[in-house]
Amino acid sequence: MKDPYDVIKRHYVTEKAKTLEGLSLGNGEGKKKGSFCKHPKYTFVVSCDATKPLIAQALESIYADKKVKVKSVNTICVKPQPARMFRGKRKGKTAGFKKAVVTFYEGHSIG
């Protein structure tokens, strides 16, 4: 098995990812006021060659002290987006990456 920190690069923080986490906490930060889900979901940036079972094993080993169990892993490959640099004079692209939305079992949380 690879080093878990080579598989999981970092926590992915966006407004949508925070809304998913808020739904699992039941604090009403979702689309519907007071809505929540039983299974907590967290989003991570992962290695491009990481598979779903490898991501699940890496997260369970990183958070072994909290004894979390992964229920499911959904992966999304984000394509490079066009970008302009140096006040619009130079065209380029942002780097593409792979993100994983991980669902834990009820009662298990990393937060």
From Swiss-Prot:
Q: Name one Pfam family in it.
A: Ribosomal_L23
Its Gene Ontology cellular component terms are:
ribonucleoprotein complex; ribosome
**SUPFAM superfamilies named among the record's database cross-references:** Ribosomal proteins S24e, L23 and L15e (SSF54189)
InterPro entries tied to this protein: Nucleotide-bd_a/b_plait_sf, Ribosomal_uL23-like, Ribosomal_uL23/eL15/eS24_sf
Q: Does the record bear Iron-sulfur in its keywords? A: no
Q: Name one GO molecular function term.
A: structural constituent of ribosome
What keywords are annotated for this sequence in UniProt?
Answer: Ribonucleoprotein, Ribosomal protein, RNA-binding, rRNA-binding
Q: Which GO terms describe its biological process?
A: translation
Task: Give the function comment from the record.
Answer: One of the early assembly proteins it binds 23S rRNA. One of the proteins that surrounds the polypeptide exit tunnel on the outside of the ribosome. Forms the main docking site for trigger factor binding to the ribosome.
Question: Which family is this protein grouped under?
Answer: Belongs to the universal ribosomal protein uL23 family.
- HAMAP family in the record: Ribosomal_uL23_B
Report quaternary structure and partners. Part of the 50S ribosomal subunit. Contacts protein L29, and trigger factor when it is bound to the ribosome.
Q: What is this protein called?
A: Large ribosomal subunit protein uL23
Q: Which organism is it from?
A: Chlamydia caviae (strain ATCC VR-813 / DSM 19441 / 03DC25 / GPIC)
Q: What is the lineage of its organism?
A: Bacteria, Pseudomonadati, Chlamydiota, Chlamydiia, Chlamydiales
Q: Which gene encodes it?
A: rplW
